[in-house]
Regions:
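Register position in tetratricopeptide repeats
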Residues: 26, 55, 81, 115, ...
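TPR-repeat structural position
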Residues: 30, 58-59, 85, 119, ...
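Short coil turns that delineate tetratricopeptide repeat
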Residues: 11, 45, 66-67, 100, ...
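Alpha-helical adaptor scaffolds
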Residues: 70-145
C-alpha cells in the first residue's frame, strides 16, 4: 500500500509516498515533490527526482535509459490529463537531452500524443523517431496506426509492411494489416 500503511493493526496515512510526491506536483509544490522523491529508495523515485528537475528547468540528476523507458510516458500522460501544460512543455523541452540517453524517447512521446488525440504532434515525434531509429518496428506500427486513423490507407499499408519486414511475426502488426486490408488492397 502506498498512501496508507499498517501499524499495529491500525491503518495510518503514509506521508512519504510516491503518490504524495505526485500530488505535490499537481499542487505546483515542486520543492516538496523533490524532497519526497529523494527520501524514497526506488527506481520510480529516482526518476521522480529527474522529472521534478526537468519541470524546474534545471537537470542535475540525469535519468537512466530504463527510467526514461519505464516512466516518461506515464508521467507525460499524467501531466496532460491533469492540464499541467507548463509542465508538459518543460518535459517536451528536455527531449533532446532525454533522447541522448534513450533513443526511443521520441517514439514514447509520439505514443502519448497519439493516445491523447494530439495526432499532428504524434506524427511530428514519429518523424523525429524515424530519423534516429528507422529500423524500429514499433515506430512503423505506430505510423501505420496514425495513417489508418487519418484514413490514408496507402501510407498505413506502407508502414505496416515496413514493420513486418523488420519483425515478421509481430502479432499486432499482422492484425493491423488485416484491418487495413479492409480498406486498401495490400
Amino acid at each position: 500500500m502506498f498512501f496508507f500503511q499498517h501499524q499495529n493493526n491500525d491503518l495510518t496515512f503514509k506521508s512519504r509516498s510516491i503518490e504524495h510526491a505526485y500530488i505535490a506536483i499537481l499542487n505546483n509544490d515542486l520543492a516538496s515533490a523533490e524532497a519526497v522523491f529523494k527520501s524514497i529508495d526506488s527506481p520510480r523515485a529516482n526518476w521522480g527526482v529527474s522529472l521534478v528537475q526537468i519541470l524546474n528547468g534545471f537537470l542535475e540528476r540525469f535519468p537512466t535509459y530504463f527510467e526514461i523507458r519505464n516512466f516518461l510516458e506515464i508521467d507525460l500522460d499524467f501531466l496532460i490529463k491533469n492540464d499541467k501544460i507548463d509542465y508538459v512543455e518543460s518535459v517536451l523541452g528536455a527531449l533532446k537531452i532525454l533522447s541522448g540517453i534513450n533513443q526511443e524517447t521520441y517514439k514514447y512521446i509520439a505514443r502519448v500524443m497519439y493516445e491523447n488525440r494530439f495526432y499532428n504532434a504524434s506524427r511530428e515525434y514519429l518523424e523525429k523517431s524515424k530519423s534516429i531509429m528507422y529500423h524500429d518496428p514499433e515506430m512503423h506500427f505506430m505510423f501505420a496506426k496514425y495513417y489508418l486513423n487519418d484514413r490514408d490507407y496507402q501510407n498505413a499499408s506502407h508502414y505496416v509492411n515496413e514493420c513486418l519486414k523488420i519483425l515478421p511475426d509481430y502479432y499486432p502488426a499482422k492484425q493491423l494489416k488485416k484491418e487495413i486490408s479492409k480498406y486498401w488492397s495490400l
